[in-house]
A protein has these predicted regions:
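Positively charged, low-complexity/disordered segments
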Residues: 171-176
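Acetyl-CoA-dependent GNAT
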Residues: 11, 19-99, 103, 108-110, ...
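Conserved short alpha-helix immediately C-terminal to the canonical SAM/SAH-binding motif I
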Residues: 120, 144-147
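Conserved catalytic-core motifs of GNAT/GCN5-like acyltransferases
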Residues: 137-140, 152-169
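Extreme N-terminal starter segment of soluble prokaryotic enzymes
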Residues: 2-5
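Glycine-rich phosphate-binding loop
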Residues: 111, 115
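Conserved GNAT acetyl-CoA-binding A-motif
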Residues: 128-140
């Protein structure tokens, strides 16, 4: 496989990043089960559920906002493969103290499942350590089965689940 080059984003990258296909297709979702076996006890479990058919899931945030706010993000790293921009990872240190959050991770559809997302996450870990943060959190939808599998493969642990009206979010973290 050709070498993946990862570097900070520059202005010329932004139109290319906005045009990446940010949505994804999934055959599974993670479903949360809540049980109350007795007073004062709550058991929460997650189980993988196969969907009756593949589902295309839209990206949860407006991608076009990247054009206006890319310079205000804590970090924005770009992956290049054979001199072509093929993905990016957006980082924020403003959400929680001593923590870097991955708020966006997008890979060009035709080069997915080739290690590019993993390389960007490893680069984000290095960036987070250099920025004196102690945790890296991946923020994702519970429908994003491919991203959840990648996070588990890379050794991330579940650190939260947000079931607010409108958008469910799953957090996976690793200690740096």
């Amino acid at each position: 496989m050709p070498q993946i080059n990862i570097r900070p984003a520059v202005a010329a990258d932004i139109p290319l990043l906005v045009e990446l296909d940010h949505d994804y297709v999934t055959d599974y979702v993670w479903q949360m089960d809540v049980q109350r076996p007795e007073e004062g006890q709550i058991n929460i479990g997650f189980r993988q559920v196969r969907l009756p058919r593949s589902a295309r899931v839209e990206y949860p945030r407006p991608v076009r906002a990247l054009r206006e706010n890319w310079q205000s993000r804590s970090g924005l790293l770009v992956a290049r493969l054979q001199d072509q921009v093929v993905g990016y990872i957006s980082l924020s240190k403003e959400i929680a103290p001593l923590t870097t959050w991955v708020t966006d991770l997008a890979i060009m559809r035709r080069v997915r499942r080739q290690g590019i997302a993993g390389a960007l996450i490893f680069a984000a870990q290095e960036w987070a350590q250099a920025s004196n943060t102690h945790r890296l959190v991946l923020d994702m939808q519970p429908k994003n089965y491919p991203a959840i599998c990648l996070a588990l493969k890379l050794g991330f642990d579940l650190c939260g689940y947000n079931d607010q009206i409108g958008e469910r979010r799953v957090g996976k973290e690793c200690r740096l």
